[in-house]
A protein has these predicted regions:
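Transmembrane alpha-helical segments of polytopic membrane transport and secretion proteins
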Residues: 1-34, 275-289
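Hydrophobic alpha-helical transmembrane segments of membrane transport/permease proteins
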Residues: 42-77, 230-238
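Generic hydrophobic transmembrane alpha-helix motif, especially the helices
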Residues: 71, 75, 107, 112-116, ...
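Transmembrane alpha-helix signature in integral membrane proteins
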Residues: 81-116
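Loop-to-helix entry region at the N-terminal start of transmembrane alpha-helices
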Residues: 83-96, 145-165, 257-263
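Glycine-rich helix-loop "coupling/hinge" segments at transmembrane-helix boundaries
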Residues: 144-147, 158, 174, 222-265, ...
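C-terminal transmembrane helix and the adjacent membrane-cytosol boundary/short C-terminal tail
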Residues: 147, 160-161, 207, 211-217, ...
Length: 289
């Protein structure tokens, strides 16, 4: 019996090693995770590594091109663009993490229960259909217009817009797992619905939902920047990536760095998150394993 336990323990250890090797061999996951970690590190360390106050106005340095003193140049008010972009990273990552996190929790809950209980699912899916019937950005603009601009309202708006995506994915997987023979056996043996949902169905739903969360994170980064660019998101003079591009659009031919620098951060973040999502899908999806 002891030998059998040792063999099982050794097999589990080897399985973990193989999984770890497969994870790090997936270039999309590694590159995407590296980009995300760098962005999160910049967001956390922004107050420490920013060379200047992002709100400090100095008209003498107005629209200076990139140089040793100002690596990314300055904006129309003489503010250091690197400092503003770093603080903008904090805002974008904060919004992305909060929206993705709350959407994951709420969407997973709604998806599990709507898939397991048909009547409740009918109500939830009508809500999802109503939300997705309107283009996400247009709906976000309308909601922010009603609630008012500001970081909290932007986060709340993007959560509302993002929940249906998680809910639909979670519900779809729940419906598939619910029809499995072992679930029917658990129901016949008298197992509670609560136990079946959270202990037997949820572990099968989580991997696919996590992939969707990474794509939602990327969408949120673009949406937050778009709302700020349209002056209905993070209010000026807060250093959001969208605000910086909005300020730079009037001097685009004179000061290209005001568009290129924040745009590069947006592109890098979205590309990294999409690569992470694609890699996670290859790694976690049982159909590709």
């Amino acid at each position: 019996m002891t030998d059998l336990y040792q063999i099982k323990a050794q097999m589990r250890k080897e399985h973990r090693i193989l999984k770890t090797r497969k994870f790090f061999r997936n270039k999309s996951v590694v590159i995407g995770a590296a980009v995300l970690l760098i962005m999160l590190a910049l967001a956390v360390l922004a107050p420490v590594i920013s060379p200047y106050d992002p709100l400090e106005v100095n008209v003498v340095n107005r629209l200076k091109s990139p140089c040793k003193e100002f690596l990314f140049g300055t904006d129309t008010f003489g503010r250091d663009l690197l400092s503003r972009i770093l603080y903008g990273t904090s805002i974008s990552m904060k919004v992305g993490v909060l929206v993705s996190g709350f959407s994951f929790v709420i969407g997973l809950f709604l998806g599990l229960y709507s898939g397991y209980y048909p009547k409740f699912g009918a109500v939830v899916m009508r809500f999802c259909d109503a939300v997705k019937a309107i283009p996400s950005l247009m709906l976000a603009i309308a909601l922010v217009g009603v609630m008012g601009a500001g970081e909290k309202n932007v986060i709340l708006t993007l959560i509302i817009v993002s929940i249906p995506d998680i809910t639909r994915v979670a519900r779809s997987i729940t419906l598939q797992v619910k029809e499995q023979t072992y679930i029917e056996a658990l129901q016949a043996s008298g197992a509670s619905n609560l136990r079946i949902i959270w202990l037997n169905i949820m572990p099968n739903v989580i991997p696919t939902v996590l992939v969707q969360v990474s794509f939602i994170f990327a969408t949120v980064v673009i949406s937050e920047a778009s709302l700020s660019f349209l002056a209905v998101g993070i209010p000026m003079p807060e250093p959001s990536w969208g605000n910086i591009i909005n300020e730079g659009k009037t001097v685009i031919f004179q000061s290209w760095w005001m568009i290129v620098c924040p745009g590069a951060f947006i592109a890098a973040s979205v590309l990294g998150l999409n690569m992470l999502g694609e890699g996670l899908r290859d790694f976690l999806d049982p159909l590709t394993n």
